[in-house]
């Protein structure tokens, strides 16, 4: 069985017929609508299966209809749920491509072998993605560094098996 991947969160209700507003974590946001079999994770950790009946872009977000949810009151009970799918449902990537979740947690070393921390998360800036690297007990210091995710320019190597990334980065920055 593959691991679960969070692809979005239900953030509100939309209309009176049970539709829900969703914050998508996929890129582009409407890609989340490709997956019909969801697992909803409530804030208390309880899980339940859900089937996507319909969905569409609406304004700057996404709205969805779940099978069996046809009124606003029932829809309200789903607000706050994380939406997960099996990682095996995600499209296969080309060589050298990675999902953000694969990069998060990697230990980051400079070309000179200096440990500068771990990838905490990534930020989408429009121009390019940015790694947020946070220092740890094993790293040179506890600073937070923002490193542009530009393979071939700043990113020299990624080894998922060894859980590490090598960057061309001055540790003083």
UniProtKB/Swiss-Prot annotation:
Signal peptide: none annotated. Keywords: Chaperone, Cytoplasm, Ribosome biogenesis, rRNA processing. GO terms for biological process: ribosomal small subunit biogenesis; rRNA processing. InterPro entries: PRC-brl_dom, PRC_barrel-like_sf, RimM, RimM_N, RimM_N_sf, Transl_B-barrel_sf. The keyword ATP-binding does not apply. It comes from the Bacteria. Residues 95-173 form the PRC barrel domain. One of its GO terms (molecular function) is ribosome binding. Its main location: cytoplasm. Binds ribosomal protein uS19. The PRC barrel domain binds ribosomal protein uS19. Belongs to the RimM family. This is Ribosome maturation factor RimM. It comes from Hahella chejuensis (strain KCTC 2396). The lineage of its organism: Bacteria, Pseudomonadati, Pseudomonadota, Gammaproteobacteria, Oceanospirillales.
């Amino acid at each position: 069985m593959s691991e679960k991947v969070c692809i979005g969160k239900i953030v509100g209700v939309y209309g009176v017929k049970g539709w829900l507003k969703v914050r998508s974590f996929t890129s582009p946001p409407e890609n989340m609508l490709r997956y019909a079999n969801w697992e909803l994770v409530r804030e208390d950790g309880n899980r339940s299966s859900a089937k996507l009946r319909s969905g569409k872009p609406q304004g700057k977000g996404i709205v969805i209809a779940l099978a069996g949810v046809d009124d606003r009151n029932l829809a309200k009970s789903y607000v706050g749920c994380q939406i997960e799918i099996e990682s095996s449902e995600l499209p296969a990537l080309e060589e050298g491509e990675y999902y953000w979740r694969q990069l998060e947690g990697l230990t980051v070393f400079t070309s000179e072998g200096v440990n500068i921390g771990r990838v905490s998360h990534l930020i989408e800036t429009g121009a390019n993605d940015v790694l947020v690297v946070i220092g740890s007990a094993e790293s040179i210091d506890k600073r937070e560094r923002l490193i542009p995710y530009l393979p071939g320019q700043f990113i020299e190597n990624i080894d998922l098996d060894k859980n590490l990334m090598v960057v061309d980065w001055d540790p003083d920055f």
